[in-house]
Design a protein with these regions (language model features):
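Catalytic cores of the polymerase beta-like nucleotidyltransferase superfamily
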Residues: 1-445
């Protein structure tokens, strides 16, 4: 089995071997190559010590920040390559990092400490594929299987739970039976992992091809760091608009939208407030008036706890708050929504509403789609024609009003906003001379 390695990777391995050591491409780059995917990066393992690597690559730009764990980074043609000495990990006391590492001369020993069989393969042109744990076979089966005892692997590093789920979602892989059992058994260990690390994996998982299946099968695992979602499990919506439980609707809506973290997380949280907003008719039909507000408040709390960026949180909460706005296709209405949330979020909102609609029942679907398509058409025309929906686009500004003798700041703001509303509603033309005349009328000048 031959893998085509980049020229610079071959050069690094050749250089190490010419100095009397062995070296291999290892881990994800080997896995992706066997899957016929372009690796994001190439990692190299070797029996050379870090001091040997620093000597061998004298004259190259090197970093030794990871030298404690045996890693030296070498820069070749502006690309950073991590070269790590074969090692044995010491005991793990925090479910994340080994307390110490011990270097070894044995490749198989090094591979045995890795997380999954598909990541425990090494390759060099001299030896070919080194695969002591049948990772290539698991790749053929598209299976995620831990190296050795899965409970031990997850206790060593609980983030491996999220990595297993991410691989399954993004690579459309199955999780091997014993590995899956261990994930459920060890899920409480996720509480020991920093929010930023969980979010990094979860964002990728949420954008995976198989995220709907993974979110549904392993829902109790995700509830370890998202306990708020448990209220959606098995929650019947009792409305003709929905034929799925709230959790199934949510996961279905996620896969209906572009695989971007902001959009996928928005769909994950968009209906979280429904149980709190639920009111039922005497016949048992449920209504969820005001649920976007509940969902938005809960989403902000969750995203802040998980340490998402401020921009991400604000955009996500905005989309959730507006996701149930009934867009008629009226241009004045759409301009006013754009005024509140901006053009970029309006474009996202249309994607959110479509994903939500397509995860609902067939009840009135044609009617809903007709209105939705009309709204999209109106939005596209507003953007194309550069319609005014912000004060910045208004063909008059505060300086014009000051020249007219209006100097009070509050009065200036009220005048401009009143005229903007009229322009958005198409009752006033966005033309400087006309706006000046209207400003005089408003202020009785």
């Amino acid at each position: 089995m031959k893998i085509k390695m980049p020229v610079d990777v071959r050069m690094i391995i050749d250089r190490i071997e010419k100095n009397g050591f062995s070296a291999y491409a290892v881990g994800g780059c080997v896995r992706d190559s066997l899957l016929q995917k372009e690796p994001n990066d190439w990692d190299i393992c070797t029996n050379a010590l870090p001091t040997d690597i620093l000597r061998i690559f004298q004259g190259f730009h090197t970093f030794d920040a990871g030298i404690k764990h045996g890693t030296v980074s070498v820069v070749v043609n502006s690309v950073v390559y991590e070269i790590t000495t074969f090692r044995i990990d010491g005991e793990y006391f925090d479910n994340r990092h080994p307390e110490n590492v011990e270097f070894t001369d044995d490749l198989i020993t090094d591979l045995s400490r890795r997380d999954f069989t598909v990541n425990a393969m090494a390759y060099s042109e001299r030896t070919g594929l080194v695969d002591p744990f049948d990772g290539a076979y698991d790749l053929e089966l598209m299976a995620v299987r831990c190296v050795g005892n899965p409970v031990l692997r997850f206790n060593e590093d609980a983030l491996r739970i999220m990595r297993a789920l991410r691989f399954a979602s993004c690579y459309n892989m199955a999780i091997e039976k014993h590995t899956a059992q261990a994930i459920f058994e060890c899920k409480n260990l996720l509480k020991n992992i920093a929010a930023e690390r969980i979010v990094s994996e979860f964002n990728k998982l949420a954008c995976g091809e198989s995220c709907e299946y993974i979110l549904r099968r392993f829902k109790t695992v995700f509830a370890e760091f998202l306990p708020e979602i448990t209220i959606m499990f098995g929650y019947e919506q009792h409305t003709p608009h929905h034929n799925k439980t709230l959790w199934r609707h949510t996961t279905c809506a996620m896969t209906n939208i572009d695989p971007e973290p902001l959009l996928r997380i928005t769909m994950l949280l968009h209906d979280l407030g429904k149980p709190m907003a639920c009111k039922k008719d005497p016949d048992g039909t449920a209504h969820f008036k005001g649920h976007p507000k509940f969902s938005a408040v809960m989403a902000r709390q969750i995203l802040e706890r998980l340490k998402y960026s401020r921009e991400f949180i604000d955009d996500c909460v905005t989309l959730i708050a507006y996701h149930d706005v009934r867009l008629t296709g009226s241009k004045p209405q759409i301009r006013r929504v754009m005024n509140k949330i901006g053009e970029t979020n309006m474009r996202r909102l249309l994607k959110v509403q479509y994903a939500d609609l397509m995860a609902q029942s067939m009840y009135k679907r044609d009617e809903k789609l007709e209105k939705f398509n009309f709204a999209c058409k109106s939005f596209d025309e507003i953007v194309k024609e550069k319609d005014c929906f912000t004060l910045k686009q208004l063909d008059i500004n505060g300086h014009d009003l000051i020249k007219m003798g209006i100097t009070d700041g509050k009065q200036i703001g009220e005048t401009l906003n009143k005229m903007l509303g009229m322009v958005m509603d198409e009752t006033l033309e966005n033309k400087n001379s006309i706006l000046i005349q209207k400003a005089k009328e408003i202020n009785s000048l």
